[in-house]
């Protein structure tokens, strides 16, 4: 952790750097919140492959888009953003929570100990209390691919996650400049952040899931002029209905449209990652109906 402090001191010399160890400018949403930056370029890309027992035999049937989305939903409404959450003490890979099946009870208790005034700047490296963006996705992937605790994890630099996962043969990688559409389940990596696409609305806004201050939440991209979009409306509607306490504390659902132009993409290969219910063809409305109704 001494290296973290040194990194912070150096970063003060830049105009907008946060304690990310490599001086990157933060990605902000329309509220001024900062997406996860703890998983910076300095983080080790601990890109492990699924264990043998999850690559062969009956267990393969459990590795599916349905399971991935089910896991992605579980921390919603009760998991706060913590810089370094999901990482280990050495800050070079997955921590205990990110290689454990099911949500950590500590995430919910920490949420209950806090209120609308929660500020993630005050809880940096309380790694057991919540999740940052790559810790969140690493936990989701672990719970999708693995069937017991304590195996090698999937937490790594958020910036590299889409490309690294595609490199495992899990899907197709597309550079940010070439991305033209956003389907359910797409893993999207931008500088200092990673998020999960949940499909494209009629107005071309994109619904998404990510861990970004104040926590794990549904969001939508704004319109070009910064106005509210259909995706933002859906994120608010379903959060308010299903997580009213969260909505009462943190009623923020919009992210800048540049999420779309700045993010590379990994689209799951449905030949090896089952999509029996055709989630990739669903609209955000259809998906949310499946997830919550």
Give, region by region, the residue ranges found by the protein language model.
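Sec-dependent signal peptide cleavage junction
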Residues: 19-35
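Low-complexity, Gly/Ser/Thr/Pro-rich intrinsically disordered linker/tail segments
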Residues: 224-293
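...with weaker cross-activation on analogous glycine-rich loops/strands in unrelated enzymes
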Residues: 147-226
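N-terminal capping segments
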Residues: 49-146, 267-293
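Sec-dependent bacterial lipoprotein signal peptides
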Residues: 1-20
């Amino acid at each position: 952790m001494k290296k973290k402090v040194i990194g912070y001191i150096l970063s003060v010399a830049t105009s907008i750097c946060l304690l990310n160890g490599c001086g990157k400018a933060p990605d902000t949403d329309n509220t001024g919140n900062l997406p996860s930056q703890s998983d910076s370029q300095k983080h080790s890309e601990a890109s492990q492959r699924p264990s043998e027992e999850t690559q062969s035999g009956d267990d393969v049937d459990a590795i599916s888009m349905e399971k991935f989305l089910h896991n992605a939903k579980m921390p919603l409404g009760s998991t706060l953003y913590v810089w370094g959450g999901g990482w280990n003490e050495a800050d070079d890979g997955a921590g205990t929570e990110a290689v454990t099946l099911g949500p950590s009870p500590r995430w919910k208790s920490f949420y209950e100990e806090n209120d609308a005034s929660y500020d993630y700047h005050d809880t940096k490296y309380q790694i057991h209390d919540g999740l940052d963006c790559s810790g969140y996705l690493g936990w989701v992937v672990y719970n999708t691919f693995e069937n017991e605790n304590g195996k090698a994890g999937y937490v790594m630099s958020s910036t590299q996650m889409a490309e690294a996962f595609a490199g495992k043969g899990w899907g197709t990688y597309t550079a940010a400049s070439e991305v033209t559409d956003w389907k359910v389940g797409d893993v999207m990596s931008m500088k200092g952040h990673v998020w999960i696409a949940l499909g494209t609305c009629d107005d071309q806004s994109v619904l998404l899931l990510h861990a970004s201050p104040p926590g794990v939440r549904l969001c939508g991209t704004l319109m070009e002029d910064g106005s509210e979009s259909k995706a933002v409306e859906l994120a608010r509607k379903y959060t308010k209905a299903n997580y009213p306490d969260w909505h009462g504390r943190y009623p923020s659902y919009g992210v800048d449209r540049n999420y779309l132009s700045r993010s590379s993409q990994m689209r799951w290969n449905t030949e090896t990652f089952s999509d029996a219910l055709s989630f990739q063809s669903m609209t955000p409305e259809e998906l949310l109906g499946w997830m919550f109704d």
